[in-house]
Amino acid sequence: MKIYKDYSLLPYNTFGMDVKAARFVEYDSVEELTGFLAGHEDVFPCLHVGGGSNLLFTADYAGTVLHSAIKGREIVGETEDWVDIRVGAGEVWDDFVAYAVACGWYGAENLSLIPGEVGASAVQNIGAYGVEAKDLIRFVDTVCLETGCRRRFANEECCYSYRESVFKKELKGKYIVTHVTFRLGKRPAFRLDYGNIQAELGGAEPTLEGVRQAVIRIRRAKLPDPKLLGNGGSFFMNPVVPAEQFEALAQRFPDMPCYPVAGGRVKIPAGWLIDRCGWKGKSIGRAAVYERQALVLVNLGGASGKEILQLAQAVAHSVKDKFGVTIAPEVNII
């Protein structure tokens, strides 16, 4: 276990905010985590970070920041059709996807190149190109911050919805994810009807590696490398509206794209809404809307978290004024 005071969080947020944590704790086992919680009464306020790809710090953090270095992958169940694999929360997400593809297991390939760590996938319900983490997750193993007790959540207990989970709502800040068990398929099953994966494949017969590489090419063409240009990926969630509201909008904006979702509702791409408001490539101070993808806000260099937030609020206000639609941040603002 590593414990530091006044520790820079620059390596733990992809926006490139050089803020500090009053205390930073990194653990590499459940036992180390529970031991720390049992031995320290001053844990709170507390924040758990992974790769920091979904965080925007607007100031130094006055409490304890925890980071998991729990690694490992273990097959815990298997049949001719599927495999259950339990993965440490500190594993890099895309490393896990690459491993699954190399093993010939289906399900995670559309989630290639999403930044962050495995633990965050279960909290954020990450998703891309028609696939969400909830489609693969069977169990989420956790530790309660208040009691140090372990608890396993089955998929249905996680209350997953679009970019949401019980860990972001009712139980926010109460449990730390230590391991996630995924069920992946052994028989060919691709999801190619979302985005332009089919076009990127160019008519070739889909393979696991082929789909993975197609997704990687698409993402790299759209999204900036945070090592070169600080960003948190998609800053806003795609809004979901009632069908009646979408139909009214479609009368005014016939070219508005949409995706039907459960419950007779419609998902609208937030990037399209932002682009139509004229924000692509625009900036406030050193914070800007990425010129290739309006859904992404970037740090041009030296931007503060407050500048990024100011830009985000201005963008959301414009979308609300023009379309009457509220776009909410996908990024966790601290």
Indicate where each model-derived feature is located.
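Phosphate/pyrophosphate- and phosphate-bearing ligand-binding catalytic cores of soluble enzymes
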Residues: 4-5, 10-14, 55, 150-306, ...
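Phosphate/pyrophosphate-binding loops and the adjoining catalytic core of nucleotide-dependent enzymes
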Residues: 315
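Anion-binding (especially nucleotide phosphate/pyrophosphate-binding) glycine-rich loop
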Residues: 1-147
